């Protein structure tokens, strides 16, 4: 692409345009600034523009990304760091299944996303797409596509979740009965 210098990866990338400064920044890069080796898509930006959540097939955005799956990441544009969000509370990467469709809270602390990974939260045995929220301050991941008693959904919960500005509420689509 010709949006930023040095973009030679021949992949779909994520960009942020600052309308005040008229600058365009590529977001789908590693903490070291290396371009993604794989397509990136599905974006969400925090209220002040500091944090951008996105999905990517790239395995070179963070160290240890060996699951061969689409993951969700957050790029901090102030500190130039990239963090993988689609991990369990213990830091384990999602198994070989896809995580995507991020929605980030206003302050960038919480990221809701869809995933069919079965190892991001305890008791995930429904073999269905679920909705999760990652708290980047406490480094915890919670499955939110459950009923009021905490029972898992009996069908897929997917598409693009939407998290409230304060991170308290998450709206999502589900085929659960």
Language-model region placement:
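Conserved "turn/edge" positions that cap or connect secondary-structure elements
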Residues: 1-177
């Amino acid at each position: 692409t010709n949006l930023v210098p040095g973009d030679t990866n021949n992949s779909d990338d994520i960009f942020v345009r600052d309308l005040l400064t008229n600058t365009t920044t590529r977001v789908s890069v590693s903490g070291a600034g290396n371009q993604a080796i794989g397509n990136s898509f599905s974006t969400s930006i925090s209220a002040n523009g500091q944090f951008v959540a996105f999905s990517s097939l790239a395995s070179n955005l963070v160290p240890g990304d060996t699951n061969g799956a689409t993951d969700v990441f957050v790029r901090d544009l102030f500190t130039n760091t990239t963090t993988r969000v689609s991990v369990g509370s213990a830091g384990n990467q999602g198994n070989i299944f896809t995580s995507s469709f991020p929605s980030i809270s206003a302050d960038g602390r919480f990221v809701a996303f869809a995933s069919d990974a079965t190892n991001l939260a305890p008791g995930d045995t429904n073999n269905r797409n679920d909705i999760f929220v990652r708290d980047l301050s406490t480094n915890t991941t919670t499955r939110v596509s459950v009923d009021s008693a905490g029972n898992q959904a009996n069908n897929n919960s997917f598409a693009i979740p939407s998290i409230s500005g304060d991170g308290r509420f998450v709206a999502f689509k589900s085929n659960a009965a």
